[in-house]
């Protein structure tokens, strides 16, 4: 015979009859906690300890131990998979089974008078009543909420282009005007000593050395730029000096000639020693000023120079005035030679025949006056536009090709 049947038969035999007035109605199960509270409850203890405690109660010799053993064996028969781990897909269902087992253990001592049929009916009723509560409602709510959250609204659509976010470095040096320092401190023999910055920098590699070599090499453009800048300074000086000298020359001539050119002989006697040097200096200054003015116009590009002249550019007009004054000054070179040789007129009457002073000196004085006016106007025009220099701009626009290291080696060899 099966030992479970023996335990059940002995139990039915030993139980006294229960009067009708004391028979209890089936107790209602305590309300099951919600899923939220079930999640917060601590995990139930393993059933190995419960199985051990039930085995000890079965070994006791009294009837109460037999009753507990029967209940434990019946519970084991009702729950054939107590020790197998349930799948993790449905954790709330596993906790419900554990909670049901705990409720049955707590009521084991108080329901000794209840028959097996009543307990089975009660268990079936519990399962029937708990099945409707297993409906999953929250996933549907979350799906609807997620659908509502994913709905696109008009306020969420941004049509304006977003301005780029300026990215500033967190560790950046303050942007201020840097002030170069002429001295640097170099550590020598465990002490810092002041030294010049230029002397300390030396090329540390072949690349820097090649860069220094290229910088030290002068190209044709560099030479022309240096010459042009130097001659420009000389030209500016010659413009001003020529204007002052031309005015001084014409004033001296008119003072010595007297009122209405009445004392031309006095002019010849006083000015014959200065005629030749004065004419030579005037010619030199006119030549320098004319070349300087032509450099400003940039005659290398004839069409551009003609366009500037047609537009009446100040530099172009000044160059024309200087050139005209130079031509007029050269036309009176023979007269200046005659004035210089006036001291020898007693020996050679053909140079200065008697009564020929007025016919020779009138054109010379008039030409000198025109030269003075042209030089003065040209100087004024050059002063109004000192920054215009087309030749310098043309030289800066030239592209130079630096020689390779091999070509350089061949040239130096």
UniProtKB/Swiss-Prot annotation:
Concerning its family, UniProt says: Belongs to the TMEM237 family.
Q: Does the keyword Membrane apply?
A: yes
What is the designated name of this protein? Answer: Transmembrane protein 237B
Q: Where is the composition biased (Polar residues)?
A: 112-122
Tell me how this protein sits in the membrane: Multi-pass membrane protein
**Pfam families hit by this protein:** TMEM237
Give the GO cellular component terms, alphabetically.
Answer: ciliary transition zone; membrane
Organism, scientific name? Danio rerio
Q: Name one GO biological process term.
A: convergent extension involved in gastrulation
Please explain the role this protein plays, according to its UniProt record: Component of the transition zone in primary cilia. Required for ciliogenesis.
UniProtKB keywords: Cell projection, Cilium, Cilium biogenesis/degradation, Membrane, Transmembrane, Transmembrane helix
Upon gene disruption, the observed phenotype is: Fishes lacking both tmem237a and tmem237b display defects in midsomitic embryos, including shortening of the anterior-posterior axis and small anterior structures, kinking of the notochord, and broadening and thinning of the somite.
- Chain segments carrying region Disordered: 1-162
Record's subcellular location: Membrane; Cell projection, Cilium
Query: Does the keyword field hold Membrane?
Result: yes
- The UniProt transmembrane annotation reads 233-253, 274-294, 312-332, 360-380
């Amino acid at each position: 015979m099966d030992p479970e049947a023996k335990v059940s038969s002995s139990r039915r035999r030993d139980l006294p009859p229960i009067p009708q007035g004391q028979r209890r109605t089936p107790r209602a199960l305590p309300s099951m906690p919600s899923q939220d509270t079930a999640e917060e409850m601590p995990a139930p203890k393993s059933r190995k300890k419960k199985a051990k405690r039930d085995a000890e109660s079965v070994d006791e010799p009294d009837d109460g131990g037999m009753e507990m053993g029967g209940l434990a064996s019946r519970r084991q028969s009702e729950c054939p998979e107590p020790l197998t781990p349930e799948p993790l897909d449905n954790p709330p269902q596993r906790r419900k089974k554990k909670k049901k087992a705990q409720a049955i253990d707590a009521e084991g001592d108080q329901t000794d008078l209840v028959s097996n049929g009543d307990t089975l009916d009660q268990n079936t009723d519990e399962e029937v009543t708990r099945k409707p509560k297993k409906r999953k409602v929250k996933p549907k709510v979350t799906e609807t909420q997620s659908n509502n959250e994913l709905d696109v609204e008009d306020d969420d659509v941004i049509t304006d282009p977003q301005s780029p976010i300026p990215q500033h470095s967190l560790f950046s040096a303050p942007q201020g005007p840097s002030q170069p320092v002429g001295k640097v401190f170099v550590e020598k023999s465990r002490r810092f000593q002041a030294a010049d910055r230029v002397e300390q920098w030396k090329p540390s590699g072949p690349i820097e050395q090649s860069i220094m070599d290229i910088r030290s090499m002068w190209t044709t453009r560099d030479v022309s730029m240096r010459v042009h800048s130097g001659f420009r300074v000389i030209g500016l000086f010659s413009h001003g000096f020529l204007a002052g000298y031309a005015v001084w020359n014409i004033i001296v001539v008119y003072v010595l000639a007297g009122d209405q050119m009445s004392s031309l002989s006095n002019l010849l006697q006083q000015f014959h020693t200065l005629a030749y040097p004065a004419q030579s200096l005037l010619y030199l200054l006119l030549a320098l000023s004319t070349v300087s003015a032509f450099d400003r116009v940039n005659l290398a590009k004839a069409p551009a120079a003609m366009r500037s002249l047609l537009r009446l550019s100040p530099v172009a007009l000044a160059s024309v005035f200087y050139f005209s004054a130079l031509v007029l000054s050269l036309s009176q070179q023979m007269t200046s030679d005659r004035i210089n040789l006036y001291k020898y007129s007693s020996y050679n009457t053909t140079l200065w025949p008697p009564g020929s002073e007025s016919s020779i000196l009138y054109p010379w004085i008039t030409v000198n006056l025109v030269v003075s006016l042209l030089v003065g106007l040209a100087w004024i025009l050059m002063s109004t536009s000192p920054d215009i220099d087309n030749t310098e701009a043309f030289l800066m626009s030239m592209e130079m090709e630096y020689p390779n290291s091999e070509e350089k080696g061949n040239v130096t060899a």
